[in-house]
Amino acid sequence: MNYIRKHKKAALLIAVVVVVLFAFVTWQRKLTMSKSVYDELKEEPRGEAVEKDDFYYSQLTAKEGEDFLFLKEQMENLNGGVLELPQPVNGKEYQRIITALEYEGADNFYGFVDIPMTEDNVYVLYEDKDVFKITEDKISKVILFLSCAEGIHLSGEFAEDGMVSNLEKIQKGLSVNEEEKVAEIEKRQKETEALLEEILQGLPADSGKKEAIDYFLRWLDENMEFVQKAAATTEGMQNMGDMLEKVYDFNHVASLTKKKASTLGYAKIFSELCHRAGMESHLVMGSWNGGWGQSEMYIFCAVSIDGQTVYVDASGQKNASLGGKRCLSEKEAKNRMTFADYFEYS
């Protein structure tokens, strides 16, 4: 303080320099953020055929793939309830299978797999929720919850050791479907299909990949509403039926029919539109690198253009952090988000 009193001019000069440097750094950052690798990429024609979505399935081992195909078939055939896996798996394998089932194309808005159990019906995550700590092949059974099941609102009961004590009752309630609810699922599938076709009809036939991306993002911005913190609403839910109706419903392509979607829902809609427009696209999950050590789960959509992989923020929820950019290079994306490490994304 005494120095400042004695050297007012020097102190003022230092303050001016600091302000100028700060302004320069801020200007440089804005300039860098405004320059997009995406803008520099050459336009590229779209494919003529619908792109197959097998990014995750193609990375599964034979063992994991067998369980994946089994669960996918049960889901599509609406065979809910307790299911015994063809191949017992460890925690990492289970997570890879469930992730592939969740992200791989099919619009399973009406159901999901959960409650991994041992052969003796013990819920393996009863005490410790970290599935990756399960290193032995002890996951032999799971439960497929379907919104059309008569007993979808039944709650599980657990013994002190984690055994599902009312599993027989759960199985009976989840293995029988209500015809009216099945009809509702089929109706919504048709409505979703019609909406996807309507969106694609607005895309010029001669448009390239970049033009298609811009069109899909603009459509989502103008026609969909973001569901704020859907996961937070899980508090107070009594059963899996509540989860399906109030949270899970917004995580799928079928959320088009409600004009509301979560970050995951936006990403799935965008990728599905890309596939139908002849463009390879897959979801990339990870942890967003926020400030002060904070992190949250987030989703990008990866699209191949001009020999590079572009990462698209379909929901636009990180618009402010990204300086208004919606399409990032791989380097930019990895600087912003730590990709999940149980699949290969490069």
What are these regions (language model features)?
Residues 2-17:
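N-terminal Sec-pathway targeting helices
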Residues 18-28:
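Hydrophobic alpha-helical membrane-insertion segments, chiefly the h-region
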Residues 27-171:
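Intrinsically disordered, low-complexity N-terminal segments that are enriched in acidic
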Residues 174-177:
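Extended, well-ordered protein cores
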Residues 180-255:
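Secondary-structure boundary elements
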Residues 182, 186, 222-223, 327-336, ...:
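Solvent-exposed soluble domains appended to multi-pass membrane proteins
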Residues 252-266:
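A short, highly charged nucleic-acid-interacting micro-segment common to nuclease
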Residues 264-336:
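Hydrophobic/aromatic-rich core segments of domains that either
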